[in-house]
């Protein structure tokens, strides 16, 4: 919201003047960014390795809307042993939607990122370079988010588990929506790759390998017009509950 509220919003709606402090404070509740990224990177070897013979087998998780006690989420222990956690193969989530142009391009970016990590991993010096690790972690996080989105999409589109009436209602989700979402992912991955390429501590091998991630999303003019028209049709339709 902070990024999209124009100056006129502050002039016409005094609520924003009061809300800006809370809007910008919300990310702080999630913790310090560089600490979280450092923790995320501990998962990276096991996560990427799951597609290369190191996969663990876990049961599929369906949509949960039952009245169960999830209080364990608020009683998390210390962040120890993260690098030893195993993951299932992430490829099936992407294979299901591989026919969508931008999902396919994003998958190419993942392969290029994996090649970068395997052939030119962070050096001992870079392990202490927060600027380098921040960008590397952002690249990795995009992959994980992409998998989660596609897994939820498959539950909705294939199994009809759309969670109607919830904040995660996916009743109207279509494959064109997914393709448009991943157009953003492709662009963001490319942006982060360029940043990593320009890092002062990046080796020549890393700078060359990371350029393999730079891709351009495929935007169909007719599909884009349909998407924008749909987005604009939602303007003014939201009604706050009294």
Region locations from a protein language model:
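Flavin-dependent oxidoreductase catalytic core characteristic
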Residues: 1-242
